[in-house]
Amino acid sequence: MRHEQARQAAAQPQGRYVLPNIIEKTSRGEYGMDPYSKLLKERIVFLGVQIDDVSANDVMAQLLFLESEDPDRDISIYINSPGGSFTSLTAIYDTMQFVRPDISTICMGQAASAAAVLLAAGTPGKRFALENSRILIHQPSAQGEGQSSDIEIQAREILRMRSLLERMLAVHTGKKEEDIRKDIERDKIFSADEAKEYGLIDEVIKTRKSSRLATAR
């Protein structure tokens, strides 16, 4: 029975590949690091998961660390995320506006919901998407439960969050809030070129060499 359970466990799909350990050689010897730490050394923050309190804290900590290391050198945020919590979005968003360095945002794969706002919130002229990226915006949502007074409170909060989302997107796309309000009524999906036309990004890129991304860092 134990062997059968072990066999079934081994047959289950794995959530991720095993990350390789990168060996760095310096004058002081060799030391290992994971790819995310290596990227951080290059001032790259990689957001490749759902946006929740844990991932938001990770991103915020990295932004603050990189600012302390060099407040005048750009930071890059690479995004491949389905979105997530609105409060976690605002935490990262406010930190992006708070720190001194310019922040370049790059969509690789998808930037949906909260992640699309972070993509648009990069420094003007330094917001990019790879050519087959998918970007999605929509209104905030929440599940209401409890007494009628509780549901009423939650409904007011949803309206407040929606108003804030509309204002954020209007600021970073140059569109009017009423136009944003109509567009997020339902899921609105963009190709990379459509996202550029809408004002969510500044450039669609195929390679680093052929884009402003080469000089944005």
From Swiss-Prot:
Superkingdom, natural source: Bacteria
One GO CC term on file: cytoplasm
Quaternary assembly: Fourteen ClpP subunits assemble into 2 heptameric rings which stack back to back to give a disk-like structure with a central cavity, resembling the structure of eukaryotic proteasomes.
Catalyzed chemical reaction(s): Hydrolysis of proteins to small peptides in the presence of ATP and magnesium. alpha-casein is the usual test substrate. In the absence of ATP, only oligopeptides shorter than five residues are hydrolyzed (such as succinyl-Leu-Tyr-|-NHMec, and Leu-Tyr-Leu-|-Tyr-Trp, in which cleavage of the -Tyr-|-Leu- and -Tyr-|-Trp bonds also occurs)
Pfam families: CLP_protease
Main location: cytoplasm
Name of protein: ATP-dependent Clp protease proteolytic subunit 2
Molecular functions per Gene Ontology: ATP-dependent peptidase activity; ATPase binding; serine-type endopeptidase activity
InterPro entries xrefs: ClpP (IPR001907), ClpP/crotonase-like_dom_sf (IPR029045), ClpP/TepA (IPR023562), ClpP_His_AS (IPR033135), ClpP_Ser_AS (IPR018215)
Gene Ontology biological process: protein quality control for misfolded or incompletely synthesized proteins
Family matches, as HAMAP family: ClpP (MF_00444)
Family membership noted in the UniProt record: Belongs to the peptidase S14 family.
Active site: S113 (nucleophile), H138
Sorted UniProt keywords: Cytoplasm, Hydrolase, Protease, Serine protease
Enzyme Commission code: 3.4.21.92
Top EC class for this record: hydrolase
Job of this protein: Cleaves peptides in various proteins in a process that requires ATP hydrolysis. Has a chymotrypsin-like activity. Plays a major role in the degradation of misfolded proteins.
Localization (cell): Cytoplasm
Organism of this sequence: Frankia casuarinae (strain DSM 45818 / CECT 9043 / HFP020203 / CcI3)
